[in-house]
Amino acid sequence: MKQYLEIESVFAREILDSRGNPTVEVEVIAEGGFVGRAAVPSGASTGAFEAVELRDNDKNRYLGKGVQKAVENVNNIIAPEVEGMNVFDQAAVDNLMISLDGTPNKSKLGANAILGVSLATAKAAAEALGLSLYQYIGGVNAKTLPVPMMNIINGGKHADNSVNIQEFMIMPVGASSFRHALQMCAEVFHNLKKVLKDKGYSTAVGDEGGFAPNLKTDEEAIQVILEAVEKAGYKPGDDFRLAIDAASTEMYQEDGTYLFWKSGVKKTKEEMINYWEELVNKYPIISLEDGVAEEDWEGWKMLTERLGKRIQLVGDDLFVTNTTRLKKGIELGVANSILIKVNQIGTLTETLDAIEMANRAGYTAVVSHRSGETEDATIADIAVATNAGQIKTGAPSRTDRVAKYNQLLRIEEEIGAVSRYPGLDAWFNLKKK
């Protein structure tokens, strides 16, 4: 096996994401003609501490959302430096780009420029070795398929409806394999469509493929989902658990309160935590993401003390896939899980570092898409490569979401008999009920 293979060319172009906005796609070609291609995702509700996505801000073009500057940064600044490097030395390529940028949040070259090159490099390396991407990144022990966390009702910033909470998700914990898990979720999704239709609600889908009906209350979202689970022939609690992404940073006010802006309800942090506890007591919820705001460390501590042994408390805006933020969280004892979004940090190396740091501290890791996606399915491979055990990549509708699930089906098939679907064991750090 040749351990040194030169990167011959690096090229970026502007393509469109699932929302019709431009994004960056990069091709890395290694000696021998091995090509790696990667497209970069983009978020709607973004954490303040995320790496910077470079946009052109030219209002005459794509309403200011063009990414020609990021593309030029790849073609004119990054490419000349990376060409000639060893395609197998992922850390060296990533570290070189971090140095070239020189800012703490990748704001000079753009995380979208850097990430495209980073992921395409790994793909070219895998191609050169004749390996699947998950095998190249994860090695021989990459065999755990993730439990999907499927967003089937959208609210908050992801939908123009009456629902304050951003995402209501189902998790098929009782499935026997990933293939079975996907089937279960699709059946619930179709039953939910019927439940909503029968109640006179809209069944149009949002950015992530979930429904976005004008429900009477946030709690009604949970109720219609549980009805759909039962209609599909499954048992809430045994076959399915629920997950919520509150995106609370979007609700956080300067006076330290939380405003459910669509319903006009205001809550103190104590009331907010009581609210989550009431829902957890009432429904089979296993995961709560961003239950309080990214800078409300005191609120996070209270939430973790109250619910941290019972359910997964995921930090998304809180940690932004950043080891510095995660280290602070671990030291303060807040949350027990990290959401992993490659474009929040901007390189594959730093993404893998964050997952490793989380696991060492007894935190789970949930590999996640963004609301603006493409047909690129890299995150499916990352989830298996790291044995993360959970993936969050939307509803079983819209090709930009389904592309990831279909890739996981292929991976499960390729791994064969030794593949493992963890079910409830994905939550190794919780008291099992």
Curated annotation (Swiss-Prot):
Gene Ontology CC, one term: extracellular region
Keyword line: Cytoplasm, Glycolysis, Lyase, Magnesium, Metal-binding, Secreted
Uppermost EC category: lyase
GO biological-process terms attached to the record: glycolytic process
Residues that coordinate or bind (2R)-2-phosphoglycerate: 166, 341, 370-371, 392
Main location per the UniProt record: cytoplasm
Assigned EC number: 4.2.1.11
Binding note for cofactor: Binds a second Mg(2+) ion via substrate during catalysis.
Highest taxon, organism lineage: Bacteria
Compartments, as annotated in UniProt: Cytoplasm; Secreted; Cell surface
Keyword presence, tRNA processing: no
Residues annotated to bind Mg(2+): 245, 289, 316
Entry annotated with the keyword Secreted: yes
Molecular function GO terms recorded: magnesium ion binding; phosphopyruvate hydratase activity
Known pathway: Carbohydrate degradation; glycolysis; pyruvate from D-glyceraldehyde 3-phosphate: step 4/5
Cofactor (UniProt): Mg(2+)
Catalytic reaction list: (2R)-2-phosphoglycerate = phosphoenolpyruvate + H2O
Active site: 208, 341
A family per Pfam: Enolase_C
Role: Catalyzes the reversible conversion of 2-phosphoglycerate (2-PG) into phosphoenolpyruvate (PEP). It is essential for the degradation of carbohydrates via glycolysis.
Similarity comment: family membership: Belongs to the enolase family.
Protein name: Enolase
Gene coding for it: eno
